[in-house]
Amino acid sequence: MSAGSVVNRRNKILQQLSAKGSVRVTDLVEVLNVSDETIRKDLQAMEERGILRREHGGATLTSYNEEEDVGRRSTENTEVKSRIAKEALKYIPAGEPLVIAFDAGSTSYCLAQFLAQRSGQTIITSSIPVAELFNGDKNDVYLLGGKLRQKDRSLYGQWALNFISSIRISVAILGSSGVKNRNGLCAVTFDDADIKRAYIKNSERSIALLDSSKFHKCSMVESAKWEELDMVITDDGIQEEDREVLSKKTNLIVV
């Protein structure tokens, strides 16, 4: 069985969970036309990744998988996110014709607010709010195509991935959902994880921005190992244990 078919099947399970809140093994066997054993292995693997909680005869969606809208996220921990964004500016030289990619993270949005004051940049983004910051003629802005997710006003899907694969990015700016008990950057959906992976693969440098609260929250999908990132910037609220782990795996900056 190909890795692609496994991912597609588990994505369908996630869609069922998102729509209903819970699923039964017998129903999934019928809908997906696979064996009882295959479904149970899928549910076990998804539970280990923090996506669901197995129960007798099925599974339920874990409560922390609920997405928050971009407006709400942008107003949380604003002082901390501003500090992280200002630190990131030091690693993005002004006056150079850089190609800078942004995902739909709220801390990424905070950094974009500062970079919007510069000129001569090429901006690539999956986020409509980020694209709207770079108005006027000072910068070239490319908004990824694809399907619109209303929750955070971002675009995703194969069109977006095809576009990313055709370009070379100078710096990829990445946010993350909760990373508690995970080995790297996380996302709330498989589609968002795909965007992050594509950015990392096609960039010269990747910088992750995440406030320390993310280390206390669980998340659905792991999108990249810490070792794949060139830099992680967080605030001084990070616990010593998490600091030690990240310092061994990537260039960790604490502000």
Residue ranges of model-derived segments:
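Conserved phosphate- and dinucleotide-binding cores of soluble alpha/beta proteins
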Residues: S2-L17, G21-T26, N33, V80, ...
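Gly/Ser/Thr-rich loops at beta-strand to alpha-helix junctions
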Residues: S106-S108
